[in-house]
Amino acid sequence: MAASTTALSSPFAGKAVKLSPSSSEVTGNGKVTMRKTANKAKPVSSGSPWYGPDRVKYLGPFSGESPSYLTGEFPGDYGWDTAGLSADPETFAKNRELEVIHCRWAMLGALGCVFPELLARNGVKFGEAVWFKAGSQIFSEGGLDYLGNPSLVHAQSILAIWACQVVLMGAVEGYRVAGEPLGEVVDPLYPGGSFDPLGLAEDPEAFAELKVKEIKNGRLAMFSMFGFFVQALVTGKGPLENLADHLADPVNNNAWSYATNFVPGK
């Protein structure tokens, strides 16, 4: 019997399921055993400016030649790797996963740092809206209440908060690391299925562009979080308060003026 191949759509975005019986799987009584394997996503159109050898580079037309191992296959590849961190395929795969995960945490974190302060400036009452001061409210006399509502979530116990963090984050990380808790074909970075209820990944070309947008915004968010940490250490204020101070007096409230405060003898 001639071998046949059938492609079926998978519930996970960017994946296809290949049913490919080999000659050894076809028995004499005509019974066929199907084997499920993960197929690669459809290649991105050569017209995309973010992929392939002609993609946008880190210095535009002055970038020079990219390393041979940076082929433009993955989102966010601008052909720059002076430290050679991507030369080893296994190391590159690990670093790529870590970057995407940290990008997502940074985007959530940056929003979480700015949004409460924004609400507080518009009349919403918080015990403490500045992100690096909020946690210490649990030691205050009134304790810590979510959104100012003492009955919403009981947050007076540090041990209870710690336990919730361990259980909730541990469950998510366990799901991600295990990869296939339900025996399904899963991409740990872009699982699709239930994680894509809006169907944003149904069009391969649109999905490829969304990956680029995610990694670009994630990298900006990581730099933002670094800036928030530095601001907290130097000024002791939240990001929006620092922005307001800078707009009110840009000459005396900027990175250079704060940096010169640490010059010996000043």
Curated annotation (Swiss-Prot):
An example Gene Ontology molecular-function term: metal ion binding
Binding site residues for chlorophyll b 5: Q165, F262
GO cellular component terms, semicolon-separated: chloroplast thylakoid membrane; photosystem I; photosystem II
Residues engaged in binding chlorophyll b 3: S157, E173
Residues bearing PTM N2-acetylarginine: R35
UniProt-annotated binding residues for chlorophyll a 3: Q137, L147, E214
Residues engaged in binding chlorophyll b 4: Q165, R176
Chain sites annotated for binding chlorophyll a 6: H246, A255
Transmembrane domains' residue ranges: 100-120, 152-172, 220-240
Chain positions recorded as chlorophyll a 4 binding sites: N217
Cofactor binding, per record: Binds at least 14 chlorophylls (8 Chl-a and 6 Chl-b) and carotenoids such as lutein and neoxanthin.
One Pfam family per UniProt: Chloroa_b-bind
Positions where Phosphothreonine occurs in the chain: T37
Cysteines paired by S-S bonds: none
Residues engaged in binding chlorophyll b 1: Y58
Interval spanned by the transit peptide: 1-34
Domain notes from UniProt: The N-terminus of the protein extends into the stroma where it is involved with adhesion of granal membranes and post-translational modifications; both are believed to mediate the distribution of excitation energy between photosystems I and II.
Name of this protein: Chlorophyll a-b binding protein E, chloroplastic
Organism of provenance: Nicotiana plumbaginifolia
